[in-house]
């Protein structure tokens, strides 16, 4: 699985249009240069784990703002509106792993998915 640049395009409701991975392997890894282009407000049906790989990141999700120092991470649940910006002027890079909930929870009807993933 390659690390790709993420170009976030959304529909009028803010839903990201990018397909993350494939039906057989629904996971993708991205790198974003926030100095060049912040990640705009968007949401998707996948889970996302992001890590500030260089510089500080201001991340917003579910109505909260989070300051991430280099090496810090944040988990974003499916369907949550979120965005990312550089914390200060200068180099700012973000790595993210975006994956479908069925990779960890199985079916949306499973006890694991309903009890542990959906409440997050």
Predicted regions and their residues:
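Short hydrophobic-aromatic micro-motifs
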Residues: 74-76, 105
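Short amphipathic alpha-helical leader/targeting segments
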Residues: 69-70, 85
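A hydrophobic/aromatic-rich effector-binding and dimerization subdomain
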Residues: 2-12, 16-25, 81-120
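Generic protein-terminus/edge-of-domain signal
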Residues: 1-67, 73, 80
């Amino acid at each position: 699985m390659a690390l790709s640049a993420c170009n976030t395009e959304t529909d009028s409701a803010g839903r990201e249009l990018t397909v993350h991975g494939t039906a057989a392997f629904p996971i993708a890894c991205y790198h974003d240069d926030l100095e060049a282009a912040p990640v705009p407000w968007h949401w998707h049906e996948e889970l996302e784990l992001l890590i500030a790989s260089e510089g500080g990141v201001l991340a917003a999700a579910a109505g909260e703002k989070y300051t991430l120092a280099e090496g810090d991470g944040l988990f974003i649940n499916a369907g949550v509106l979120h965005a990312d910006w550089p914390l200060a002027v200068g180099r700012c890079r973000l790595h993210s792993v975006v994956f479908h909930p069925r990779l960890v929870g199985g079916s949306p009807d499973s006890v694991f998915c309903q009890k542990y993933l959906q409440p997050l």
